[in-house]
């Protein structure tokens, strides 16, 4: 079974997808982390001097594809974690994700991960482009104000103001929804869930109710 969870930044996609995968004992793939891994690498020496095609032709980064474990990212064998969470990396990931060669490269890796079976994929084009025939498609949304507050809590104390985070979210929304290649859209057949006034548990309950009839 393939479950896709798409939506803009700050809607709780990662938290919900990871918890859902754990509840179902499914594999979990955070595709945004895949793009951020490429972005982080591209911002580092010596790879920042390479053309992007050169970088993806011979990537120094890799991803673990192990059944029962979340996908993990490595750069020259070193596990990446907090390095992928900075605004600089997120902004670069958004720019790189607009390149056809980058999207093709990532989508091939994501489909390879799906071969493990029983996966929850979280991203922005999972249900619309990568897995249009997914068994269950969810599109998470929330108000920009709520999303800004959530993102603010994830950042180091006083690193950015609420207004700055809000502006970044609006800009990212515009970039994702207006790009010519695989824009952020509600996938055909997806169930839209507004998480603005819902707890994590409440969102999980709603998604579980959708999935239960489809489980063997």
Swiss-Prot record:
Protein name as annotated: Cytidylate kinase
The keyword Transferase is annotated on this UniProt entry: yes
Assigned protein family: Belongs to the cytidylate kinase family. Type 1 subfamily.
EC number: 2.7.4.25
KW Ribonucleoprotein (keyword) present: no
Source organism of the structure: Chlamydia abortus (strain DSM 27085 / S26/3) (Chlamydophila abortus)
Broad class of enzyme this protein falls into: transferase
Subcellular location: Cytoplasm
Lineage: Bacteria, Pseudomonadati, Chlamydiota, Chlamydiia, Chlamydiales
GO cellular component: cytoplasm
